[in-house]
């Protein structure tokens, strides 16, 4: 994989690294003591990385579901508003609960003194969305 300033043709490995790395904070001259230039070391970097993946994966799941609901319920008197609620929950849910859970994850990593690689942020962020989707489809809350 190529370094940022090398200027060569990166190929697919360079593109994958660029997608997963998020490039949140420039490492030049900001005083961050991180042994690896691609890892996330500070709390805001870790929090933002996990939160961004949670938000985007939630939008990825909820937008098609909302559009499908809008299409199938377009002639229903009140049913068409359900699609709006699906779309809103795809954004409002991760913004409210995702902020807290991402901060908790980043806090645990920071307290342990562990750095987070971008793939861990991807896994933890999409894992939050996966848990929400599983609870929604299994209807666990309706059995309580």
UniProtKB/Swiss-Prot annotation:
Keywords: Endoplasmic reticulum, Glycoprotein, Membrane, Nucleus, Transmembrane, Transmembrane helix. Residues 72-85, 138-144 are cytoplasmic. The lineage of its organism: Eukaryota, Metazoa, Chordata, Craniata, Vertebrata. Interacts with RTN4. Acts as a regulator of endoplasmic reticulum (ER) and nuclear envelope (NE) morphogenesis. Affects the ratio between tubular ER and ER sheets by promoting sheet formation at the expense of tubules. Influences NE expansion, nuclear pore complex formation and proper localization of inner nuclear membrane proteins. Coiled coil: none annotated. It comes from the Eukaryota. One of its GO terms (cellular component) is nuclear envelope. It is found in: Endoplasmic reticulum membrane; Nucleus envelope. Residues 1-50, 107-116 are extracellular. This is Transmembrane protein 170A. It comes from Mus musculus (Mouse). InterPro entries: Transmembrane_pr_170. It is a multi-pass membrane protein. GO terms for biological process: endoplasmic reticulum tubular network organization; nuclear envelope organization; nuclear pore complex assembly. Glycans are attached at residues 30, 36. Belongs to the TMEM170 family. The chain crosses the membrane at residues 51-71, 86-106, 117-137. Pfam families: Tmemb_170 (PF10190). The keyword Glycoprotein applies.
């Amino acid at each position: 994989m190529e370094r940022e300033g090398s200027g060569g043709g990166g190929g697919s490995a360079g593109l994958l690294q660029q997608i997963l790395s998020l490039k949140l904070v420039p490492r030049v001259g900001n005083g961050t003591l991180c042994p690896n230039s691609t890892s996330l070391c500070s709390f805001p970097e870790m929090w933002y990385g996990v939160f961004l993946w949670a938000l985007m994966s939630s939008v990825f799941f909820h937008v098609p579901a909302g559009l499908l609901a809008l299409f199938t319920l377009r002639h229903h008197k009140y049913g068409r508003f359900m699609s709006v609620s699906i779309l809103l929950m795809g954004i409002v849910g991760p913004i409210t609960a995702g902020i807290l859970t991402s901060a908790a994850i980043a806090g645990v990593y920071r307290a342990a003194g562990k750095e987070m690689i971008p793939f861990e942020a991807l896994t933890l962020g999409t894992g939050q969305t996966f848990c929400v989707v599983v609870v929604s489809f299994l209807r666990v809350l309706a059995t309580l």
